[in-house]
UniProtKB/Swiss-Prot annotation:
Pfam families: PapZ_C, RapZ-like_N. This is Nucleotide-binding protein SYNAS_12170. Displays ATPase and GTPase activities. ATP binds at residues 13-20. It comes from Syntrophus aciditrophicus (strain SB).
Length: 289
């Protein structure tokens, strides 16, 4: 059986145990996340991600009793997925009855088994999910956890020890003609660099091509810019980490998002990955004409 490289994490557990917080923690370290994914759609979803989204290497989703058929179908679906070569990691969250009751009282949320009292719903849900808890690869007791502590536990588990608790860095290359990325924390304009678009032999290639990369980096302005940029990152990133910021998005833009911004975003990726930061890069406009 051929193994699939897509990393699949299923977050499940008792209502009120912190599943949404755990999902956000994984999103902050680069997982593609989906809340309340119907389990019957999981095989199709994973096939689409494997075939069409090569930039996505890890996905996480919350599945629980909000889906009425979950209990009857999850075991067969999980076995089907594993038979196709996917490795599923199940994270099960729980807390004591008193802690869950207190959280429901604080938030005034309705328990999914709302036809009974909250306490009876907690008891029934715990009973129905017992077999799933026994299947789990990681079981987390959130009774004494606040939001920040739970996020830390989840991220420590899924990040290598060298990157745990480090700021996650998301890089985007883009073209100004298509608009700025809405979620950018820092925007770097590299339109001052020599443009391969005006070189006939380079025009049709993008910033991943070695000839384009060499052309852009051969400019004196490029080497000076990168050195000053790396100095800035060395100053800024530890300060963001000290403030507890979990994630930063750095956007690098040129005119069309095909040449200069791609080269510079890749250089930044090499810089951060070489220092063991969790980092990914998305070349938003590289395929546009």
């Amino acid at each position: 059986m051929k193994m699939n490289n897509l990393r699949v994490v299923i977050i499940t557990g008792l209502s009120g145990s912190g599943k949404s917080t755990a999902l956000r923690a994984l999103e902050d370290i680069g997982f593609y996340c989906v809340d309340n994914m119907p389990v019957v759609l999981l095989p199709q979803f994973l096939e689409i991600q494997s075939d069409k989204s090569k930039d996505i290497s890890q996905v996480a989703m919350v599945m629980d009793l909000r889906e009425k058929s979950f209990i009857e179908t999850y075991k067969g679906i999980f076995e089907q997925i594993k038979a196709r070569g996917y490795k599923i990691e199940i994270v099960f969250l729980y807390a004591t009855d008193d802690a869950l009751l207190h959280r429901f009282s604080e938030t005034r949320r309705v328990h999914p088994l709302s036809s009974v009292s909250i306490m009876e719903g907690i008891r029934l849900e715990r009973e129905q999910l017992r077999a799933l808890e026994e299947m789990a690869d990681k079981v987390i007791d959130t009774t004494s956890c606040n939001v920040h502590q739970l996020k830390d536990i989840v991220q420590r588990h899924f990040l290598p020890s060298s990157t745990a608790r480090r700021l996650f860095i998301h890089l985007i290359s883009f073209g100004y003609r298509y608009g700025l990325p809405a979620d950018a924390d820092l925007v770097l304009d590299v339109r001052f660099l020599p443009n391969p678009y005006w070189v006939e032999s380079l025009k049709s290639f993008n910033g991943h091509h070695q000839d384009v990369r060499r052309y852009v980096l051969s400019a004196e302005a490029s080497s000076i810019f990168l050195q000053k940029l790396f100095d800035l990152m060395e100053f800024l990133i530890p300060l963001y980490e000290k403030e507890g910021k979990p994630r930063i998005t750095i956007a690098v833009g040129c005119t069309g998002g095909k040449h200069r911004s791609v080269v510079m975003a890749n250089e930044l990726w090499s810089y951060f990955s070489g220092r063991d930061y969790p980092v990914n890069v998305n070349h938003r406009d590289v395929g546009k004409s």
